[in-house]
Amino acid sequence: MNMYIERIGQGPDLVLLHGWGLNGAVWQEIVPLLQPYYRLHLVDLPGFGYSRDVIMPDSRLATWSETVLAELPARFDLLGWSMGGLIALRMALDHPSRINRLILTGSSPCFLRQDNWPGIHPDVLSGFNCALQQNPRKTIERFLAIQSMGSESVKEDVKRLKSWLQQRPDAAPAALSAGLALLSSVDLRTELSQLRCPVLGIYGRQDSLVPAAAVDPIEKLITGSRSVVFAQAAHAPFISHPQQFSEALRQFLEQNEIQRD
């Protein structure tokens, strides 16, 4: 079974990868702002949304990357949010000739808190994993609330996230567990110096999952990258601040023009 990918708009190809527990509907706030300029590929990752029944042979990050990449254009720009950012990084590292430019939002090469590395406390992730086995939907809704905390439009953000979640089939339990395992175990920090494409990070200063304290360390690990931090945004700045987010993305792509065949 093929993944579900919604394709909208005209122009250079821009692929969007959503985060844990959600689906491609999460981009609805920025789609109208971007579709006049780009051919958008809104992916439902394997096991999520309309791709619920897409089964991968294993749950390694490279397998997520290869499974998604197999259904994408020959060359494209790539936007990854949260867990989708990990998959996007793996793609860009393994297939530099396919990725023109990379935008990461609310994402980190290592989500787990480490010595001298800001991130999510291990107890939080293990707690989510335990709760997931008992009540998946309630666990996802709790996750949505946590990632919206601190946003100046927190109630509206959570309401919209829940609405988009309900528009498509529930995620497969195996995909939810595999996604949490990625967030708990993947650490790409030592590989970031190998990235060859221009990279932009867009963050929210109120993000409790990718703390603002991680922004500078991430930027230092990616040669030539730049970051934008929205003071009143949390984990999903493209939802709380769609206009500013779209402007930052478009400016980055325009300033880093790629020679096309």
UniProtKB/Swiss-Prot annotation:
Q: Where is the active site?
A: S82 (nucleophile), D207, H235
- Molecular functions (GO terms): pimelyl-[acyl-carrier protein] methyl ester esterase activity
Q: Which pathway does it take part in?
A: Cofactor biosynthesis; biotin biosynthesis
Enzyme class per UniProt: hydrolase
- EC number assigned by the record: 3.1.1.85
Q: Which UniProt keywords apply?
A: Biotin biosynthesis, Cytoplasm, Hydrolase, Serine esterase
Instruction: List the record's Gene Ontology CC terms alphabetically.
Output: cytoplasm; membrane
The record, for InterPro entries, names: AB_hydrolase_1, AB_hydrolase_fold, AB_hydrolase_sf, BioH
Subcellular location field: Cytoplasm
Which branch of life, at top level? Bacteria
What biological process terms from GO does the record include? biotin biosynthetic process
- All copies of the AB hydrolase-1 domain together span 14-242
Q: Which Pfam families match?
A: Abhydrolase_1 (PF00561)
Q: Where does substrate bind?
A: W20, S82, M83, F143, L144, A145, I146, Q147, H235
Alphabetical list of SUPFAM superfamilies matching this protein? alpha/beta-Hydrolases
Q: Where mainly found?
A: cytoplasm
The UniProt catalytic activity note for this protein reads: 6-carboxyhexanoyl-[ACP] methyl ester + H2O = 6-carboxyhexanoyl-[ACP] + methanol + H(+)
Q: Check the record and name the HAMAP family matching this protein.
A: Carboxylester
Subunit description: Monomer.
Annotated function: The physiological role of BioH is to remove the methyl group introduced by BioC when the pimeloyl moiety is complete. It allows to synthesize pimeloyl-ACP via the fatty acid synthetic pathway through the hydrolysis of the ester bonds of pimeloyl-ACP esters.
Return the similarity comment: Belongs to the AB hydrolase superfamily. Carboxylesterase BioH family.
The record ties this protein, via PANTHER family, to: AB HYDROLASE SUPERFAMILY PROTEIN YCLE, MONOACYLGLYCEROL LIPASE
What's the protein here called?
Answer: Pimeloyl-[acyl-carrier protein] methyl ester esterase
Name the source organism: Tolumonas auensis (strain DSM 9187 / NBRC 110442 / TA 4)
